């Protein structure tokens, strides 16, 4: 048995969906532990492109339990839409489970998210506008609605009175938005509750029953390390904890239950929305990476900002998450480049530093110091073994492993499942018996 956490080692969009899908074949339970519909992952199965925001990638395996955990925030309308999409594609969803204690994104959360972002003007933080921050804020203020509240008209009405009154006041007086009607919300969300009822479970009990039976449990994070509320580029962050420690809180398990932590990183770096990005590219190479990599957000459709691989934030992700190994994705996107830069340090106020500064103001001043490596100028898309890779591509991967001081377990060379080199099974293989030198 091995219980594994999969996290993003950059600013999200690293390709966690594909890696989770790959590892789900060996998992009995897949748990999404934080975030909401602000995340998105794309999975390709038999030429079908499936875009999911809430439901874990493991849903594609009929014998796998897929649990949306207590640490998530759930937009039930989106979840029901995803369920229908999966059913329309003849995918068995009997293993889909939803924590009764997960918090619910309400209509006023979405309205406030968009209104607040608009009011920030040039101070905007790049929110997806899906109501995630306001939902987590209500959770912290103990004003939130939970999935279990959708099971009872009386309970929902009782729980909704105070927050809706407060939010209607804000919407009207500050943002000039018409107030929401409580009876309409109650009817809508009770209906969502009826549709989701068969999936609702006790999250903690479900996970610990599986653990007692020595089942393999895969914990799936959304977003990435540098978007973590406490450890990311604050305030340009999400409202939860995507780092590996967030799995314990969001799923309700102790750290001793976790056996391994796998970090997913692109062979280059991307970022969506606002915030500093030291290795960001502009011009033709940026366009090439964006076009070849299909760098448009699953959730927002926004064009992603592209840059060279940043080893400084990579090493930071290794430390913050306690990574055991890495999965490197989209290596094939670099196939046509003559030369490739890797950021090995920063220059800040005339001094060389090799650490991630905690001040976002300092981070904005950081200039990357690059190591230049030769490109391989040939396709890697059909490589299925390490020895199939061009020597320059192998050298690139070895340099990444050495720079980040953690071995590489998986290399992804395209969106399809079979476009993958598994150097060592991160779930069943021996720890650290991987590509690291």
From Swiss-Prot:
Gene3D superfamilies for the chain: Adenylosuccinate Synthetase, subunit A, domain 1, Adenylosuccinate Synthetase, subunit A, domain 2, Adenylosuccinate Synthetase, subunit A, domain 3
Cofactor note text: Binds 1 Mg(2+) ion per subunit.
Residues binding substrate, per UniProt: 298-304
GO cellular component terms, A-Z: cytoplasm
Binding site for GTP: 12-18, 40-42, 304, 330-332, 412-414
One of the record's GO molecular function terms: magnesium ion binding
Catalytic residues (UniProt): 13, 41
Pathway linked to the protein: Purine metabolism; AMP biosynthesis via de novo pathway; AMP from IMP: step 1/2
Keyword Cytoplasm carried by entry: yes
EC id: 6.3.4.4
UniProt entry keywords in alphabetical sequence: Cytoplasm, GTP-binding, Ligase, Magnesium, Metal-binding, Nucleotide-binding, Purine biosynthesis
Subcellular location: Cytoplasm
Pfam families named among the record's database cross-references: Adenylsucc_synt
Superkingdom of origin: Bacteria
Recorded catalytic activity of this chain's protein: IMP + L-aspartate + GTP = N(6)-(1,2-dicarboxyethyl)-AMP + GDP + phosphate + 2 H(+)
A GO biological process held by the record: 'de novo' AMP biosynthetic process
Binding site for IMP: 13-16, 38-41, 128, 142, 223, 238, 302
Keyword set includes Cell membrane: no
Binding residue positions for Mg(2+): 13, 40
Main location: cytoplasm
Cofactor: Mg(2+)
Similarity comment: Belongs to the adenylosuccinate synthetase family.
PANTHER family in the record: ADENYLOSUCCINATE SYNTHETASE
Quaternary organization: Homodimer.
Chain's role: Plays an important role in the de novo pathway of purine nucleotide biosynthesis. Catalyzes the first committed step in the biosynthesis of AMP from IMP.
Name assigned to this protein: Adenylosuccinate synthetase
